Amino acid sequence: MGLLHADCPCASWPTLCEQLQAGPDKDVQEYCQWSRRRLQRDDDTPVAGLRALIVGHTPLQRVRVLGNIWHIDTGGWSRGHFSLLELGSLTLANPMPGE
């Protein structure tokens, strides 16, 4: 299980870990924090070495899963709702309030 703010720039989690441990890399750090590329391209390529990668950053109406990446920012801080994901089973506690 991995957790990042926005997305993973690498094809595998171990590669990202190696890059981050090698020292500061502004491009990698910015991608992890700000990228919306996967969502914009509907890229369902999984990140190898993980069961699931949990990300946020881009508010959506519903949780969206692309490959093994779970986009769980549903705008709870604004006008949306908070999404709760049970990590053991990868099930949403309340997929969409009111439904």
State the predicted function of each range:
Residues 1-71, 75-80, 89-98:
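Acidic, His/Gly-enriched loop-helix segments that form or flank divalent-metal centers
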